[in-house]
């Protein structure tokens, strides 16, 4: 049985790898024009015209499969189940790579990244250069336009799996948006089932030999070799900003498979725990040791493993995304 299971996992890993190399089948239909190029994204409503009924915007970030439209639908379903579909705008950015652009004949105006570099906030490879995190900043800036969104009160940035990695690191490095404060628009982050987290010190929950894993404290796992997007901020400043932000960790109670095909099994990630659920608990414990008054929340979703749709549409997911 173990041999058969191993073969099945091998097939799953191969399929995921092939999907990444061959490009996505579905490219989101909308475009957000930025100076560096056009960002592919999906929208639940046309945000180019005023949306006077929208009080909340949900920016939902896909994982490494870059299936933004799947996440867009999960966000729409979660909002509808929570009874807030009418006043919620769902935005699903799509961080395409070079294979996606080639497969879908997208031309030279659509932003693209090398492989999965977008997860760590690296700049696009074309047509211009912009960090994936800076692209999120531009979405937030657009939402601060009171002519288009006169009733907006809250922006929620949520991501699952690879998208959870993006949201965690973006919450850590993300630039301030004074316009939101001026306009009374709050900003929250929901980090769901990421494979790893960025630590602020060399401390890790699992004993390991640093000599055999020299990159354990490099970005995206630690504070060494930070991306250009961070600018001149140091680790201490980043940590103080991060712990002050409104962050919820949404973890699947059954996301406990140490051999999951999409789990980061690098030595850098293994220092954080054996599987996603324990890695999440370990990280929050680490933060609470350093900041006893930490206001972050950890919410488990019973009976759910590594499934973005079930996480966000669950009663717990709805409550986190759309608190009444």
Each predicted region: which residue ranges?
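Conserved acidic catalytic loop of the alpha/beta-hydrolase fold
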Residues: 134-152
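Structural cue for short, hydrophobic secondary-structure segments
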Residues: 58-63, 92, 249
């Amino acid at each position: 049985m173990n041999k058969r299971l191993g073969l099945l996992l091998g097939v799953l890993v191969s399929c995921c790898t092939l999907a990444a190399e061959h490009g996505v089948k579905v490219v989101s239909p909308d475009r957000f024009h930025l100076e560096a190029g056009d960002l592919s994204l999906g929208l639940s409503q046309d945000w180019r015209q005023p949306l006077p009924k929208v009080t909340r915007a949900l920016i939902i970030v896909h994982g490494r499969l870059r299936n933004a439209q799947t996440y867009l639908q999960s966000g729409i379903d979660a909002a509808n189940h929570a009874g807030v579909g009418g006043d919620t705008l769902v935005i699903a950015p799509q961080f395409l790579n070079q294979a996606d652009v080639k497969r879908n004949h997208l031309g030279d105006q659509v932003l693209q990244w090398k492989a999965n570099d977008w997860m760590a906030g690296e700049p696009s490879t074309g047509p211009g250069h912009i960090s994936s995190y800076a692209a999120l900043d531009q979405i937030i800036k657009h939402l601060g336009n009171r002519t288009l969104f006169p009733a907006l009160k809250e922006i929620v940035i949520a991501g699952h799996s690879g998208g959870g990695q993006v949201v965690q690191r973006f919450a850590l490095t993300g630039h301030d948006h004074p316009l939101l404060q001026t306009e009374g628009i709050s900003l929250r982050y929901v980090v769901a089932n990421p494979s790893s987290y960025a630590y602020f010190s060399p401390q890790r929950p699992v004993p390991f030999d640093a000599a055999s894993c020299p990159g354990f404290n490099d970005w995206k796992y630690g504070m060494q070799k930070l991306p250009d997007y961070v600018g001149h901020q140091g680790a201490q400043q980043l940590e103080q900003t991060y712990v002050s932000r409104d962050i919820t960790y949404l973890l699947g109670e059954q996301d406990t498979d140490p051999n999951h095909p999409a789990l980061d099994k690098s030595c850098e990630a293994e220092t954080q725990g054996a599987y996603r659920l324990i890695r999440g608990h370990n990280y929050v414990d680490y933060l609470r040791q350093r900041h006893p008054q930490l206001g972050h929340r950890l919410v488990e979703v019973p009976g759910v493993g590594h499934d973005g749709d079930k996480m966000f549409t669950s009663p717990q997911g709805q409550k986190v995304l759309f608190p009444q």
